Amino acid sequence: MRHTNDELAQNVAERWCWEVTHRDDTRVARRLSCQQEVDGVYRLDEGAVLDDFFHLLDQIGVMAVLAEARGTAMQREMVPYVQDVLLYGLKTRFGIERMNALPALLFSDAALMPLVGFKAQHVRQGVCQRGAATRQGERTPGPISPAILAHHIVKLNVWDLECVFNGAIRAWAKAGVFSPQVTGMADGTDLETTERYTGCGQVTRTVRLEDTWGTGHEIAVTVYGWKVLLLLAAVTKMPLAVQVGQSQEHEALWARALVTQARMHLAGYARLSQVFCERGFMEGTTRWWLDQQGIRLVVPAKTNMAVTAEAHAHAAAGEDLTVGRRVHTVRHGQGRTAWTERVATEVVGMTGLTTYDHYGTPEHKRHANRRDFQAHRINAVVVRKWQGQDQGPAGKTVFLTNAPVEQPLPPFEDDDNRSLIEHCCSKEAKQPWDLGHPPQKTERAVRVHVLFTLRLFALATAYRLPCEREATGREPVGWQRWRRQLLEQTRELVIVFAQDYDGIFHLAEYSLLVGVKRKDRPPGIGTRQDVLAKYRLMSRH
């Protein structure tokens, strides 16, 4: 929904105060007009990024669950554990990569710290004075040290974290964020680390490199780290399920777990009806299991499979095929040098392929060499023309599907959405959401960080997209542009803290309240008398 600057300010100040400050513009304005001392005056630009998001989480019960979060093996707490979670949430939300950068970029921000429960005194002196007498050099600003935050957040119970965010995704489903029929896209991405991370996996891969003369060379490269498996909703690009495995583990081991987790989140409010994935992500037994669950799938076939050769032969023969064609205009270049091209796409669909022996239960697969073996039938879509390239009657790329192929273009076009995963989630999470920098170099830290980051990304995405559509009616914009839009709306606002209260004012209003005469006043900002009347204050001469 579209908000005024006053409403945005109200949301930022009121909804993020962790039982520390209370919104009272009139009380704070009175102190300003009387020239009384206040605790601090800060810009509100960073707080604008938070906006209604965390208020909505509070409404659906997520904040209450976070308040009950506990770390494992925590003997005592000088700071409520929820404040550690909120601090780490701010780090994740603002994309701060390194823990050591927190004092300069976050902990020293006196405008944000009161919003998560720390007062200005905590920012300057910390919550604990232990060791202050023996400290050499200046104290690092902030309520706690980055090492303490990392130590506490890693002790977060992974099962509790799963329950918190899984319940939140179900709440979004209940609110109608998803359509009744949801299409899922499954893919995996590497989270590379060094060998110094305890518990990391390792895998050796062959990489082909070319020298300056164009000669190719193959070298073996060992990669350390983990593998993040995702199942996204195709329309919202919201992660429905997340699994973390070691880098050497195959994606197929996690396919059923992803689908089961996503179906659990949507149960009662929506249905996972289709799944698209890359080659090798799902083996034949998993594809058969999806078929028995009533879930349609589209997956590219490997070139060395017998069913791929059978599909090429059927396409070349041209018998019992359904043909789909599409021609669209593609624009190239910019300005005067721009030119357009008509690009044709042609695909053919076929049914009843019988050479996919692994398409069935594990018991069915073991009988593949028996004389009385009967393979389960599967459909296919073969691409003959794509992006202006003619692959001949037999085609090149083959997609296996259990969906109807009377119209072969829809399965082919739907598979194109799979390529959006790297741009809409994996790259977004790795770059602005900082997926690749866990707080510690341990397996537990990596798992907590990945789950925390992707679940927060999922919740924020589910909140952002409906707001954009309602406010602008345009296509959704990326996270970075959306952040810039929020910053633009609140760049001229300041937040004033006075004892246990805070107030949000336009910079021009603040200037007039403290007695500064301004020749240039923005539209909508009257004289000092008008500002005093707005806050129901008597004029003081």
Model-derived features: where do they sit?
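Short, solvent-exposed helix-loop connector elements
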Residues: 68-76, 407-417, 431-448, 467-468
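Charged, often Cys/His-bearing segments associated with DNA-binding zinc-finger transcription factors
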Residues: 1-56, 530-533
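An anionic, glycine-rich sequence signature occurring as long contiguous blocks
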Residues: 4, 12, 296-420, 536-541
